[in-house]
Curated annotation (Swiss-Prot):
It comes from Maridesulfovibrio salexigens (strain ATCC 14822 / DSM 2638 / NCIMB 8403 / VKM B-1763) (Desulfovibrio salexigens). It comes from the Bacteria. Disulfide bonds: none annotated. Coiled coil: none annotated. This is Probable transcriptional regulatory protein Desal_2886. Keywords: Cytoplasm, DNA-binding, Transcription, Transcription regulation.
Length: 248
C-alpha cells in the first residue's frame, strides 16, 4: 500500500527512541514472556523464536532472555502478565491501536485513557478501529540490495502475499500464520531483512498536515513512555517534510 514505508519508518524511529530511553529490554522481556506461555522451546514455538530474534537484534543479554523464557513457562515467578489491546482516536481523527502487556489492567487502561485525552485524542470502544488494520508479517529489505522480482520469487512459494516498493525499501507482507516459513525462506536464500515483525498494518492511510502529525507523534511518544505499552499503531500518512525532519 502506498505510504506504508513512511509508517514503517515511524516504527523504526520508535525503536531507536526506546533504546535511548533504556526501555527496550523491558519491552523485549515482556514479548518473550508472553510468547513463552505457548512453550519454552523456540524450535517448536515460532512466536518465541521471533521474540528471541528481536531481543538479540538489540543486543539483549542471553541471561535476560533465558530469565524471561522461564517466567513465561512458569519456572520463575513474574510471568503473570497478559496482552491487552486498546483502541481510540488521535488528533485529526487518526485511528490508534495500543498493544499493552500488563499485570494490572485497571491501572493500564486508566493511564492509556489519560494519555489519549491529554494528547488530543480519546479512548474508543472495543472494535471501533481494529477493523481498519490487518495483522501481517512484515519484512523490510533494502531496495539497493534486492529487487522486487527477486523477493517475490523467494517469498511467494513460502506464502508471501505481496512485495511493496516505496522510496528505499521493499516490504514483503504475509499472513501471520505464514510468517515463520517466509522468514525461513529468506534466511535460506541469504536475504537479510532490515527489520522483521508482526504488525498491524493500516488498510488505508489518512493524510494529516504537519501540525497534526507533530501532535500525533507527541501522543505516540507519551503512550510509549508507559512501561505497559508495547506498540502503538496508527493509520496516519505522515507528511514527507516531517519525515525529512526526522532523518536530520
Amino acid at each position: 500500500m502506498a505510504g506504508h514505508s513512511k509508517w514503517a519508518n515511524i516504527q523504526h524511529r520508535k525503536g531507536r527512541q526506546d533504546a535511548k530511553r533504556g526501555k527496550i529490554f523491558t519491552k523485549m522481556a515482556k514479548d518473550i514472556i508472553l510468547a513463552a506461555k505457548g512453550g519454552g522451546d523456540p524450535a517448536m514455538n515460532p512466536s518465541l523464536r521471533l521474540a528471541i530474534s528481536k531481543a538479540k537484534a538489540v543486543n539483549m543479554p542471553n541471561d535476560k532472555i533465558d530469565t524471561a523464557i522461564k517466567k513465561g513457562t512458569g519456572e520463575l515467578a513474574g510471568g503473570d502478565i497478559s496482552e491487552v489491546m486498546y483502541e481510540g482516536y488521535g488528533p485529526g481523527g487518526v485511528a490508534i491501536l495500543v498493544e499493552a502487556a500488563t499485570d494490572n489492567k485497571n491501572r493500564t487502561v486508566a493511564e492509556v485513557r489519560h494519555a489519549l485525552g491529554k494528547g488530543g485524542g480519546s479512548m474508543g470502544e472495543a472494535g471501533c478501529v481494529a477493523w481498519m488494520f490487518d495483522k501481517k508479517g512484515v519484512m523490510v529489505f533494502d531496495a539497493e540490495k534486492y529487487t522486487e522480482d527477486q523477493l517475490l520469487e523467494i517469498g511467494l512459494e513460502a506464502g508471501a502475499e505481496d512485495v511493496i516498493a516505496e522510496d528505499e525499501s521493499l516490504e514483503v507482507h504475509c499472513m501471520p500464520e505464514d510468517f515463520s516459513e517466509v522468514q525461513k525462506a529468506f534466511e535460506a536464500a541469504e536475504c537479510e531483512a532490515k527489520s522483521s515483525d508482526l504488525a498491524f498494518v493500516p488498510k488505508n492511510l489518512v493524510e494529516v498536515d504537519v501540525p497534526t502529525a507533530k501532535k500525533l507523534m507527541n501522543l505516540m511518544e507519551k503512550l510509549e513512555d508507559n512501561d505497559d505499552v508495547q506498540n502503538v499503531h496508527v493509520n496516519a500518512d505522515f507528511p514527507d517534510e516531517l519525515m525529512a525532519e526526522m532523518e536530520d
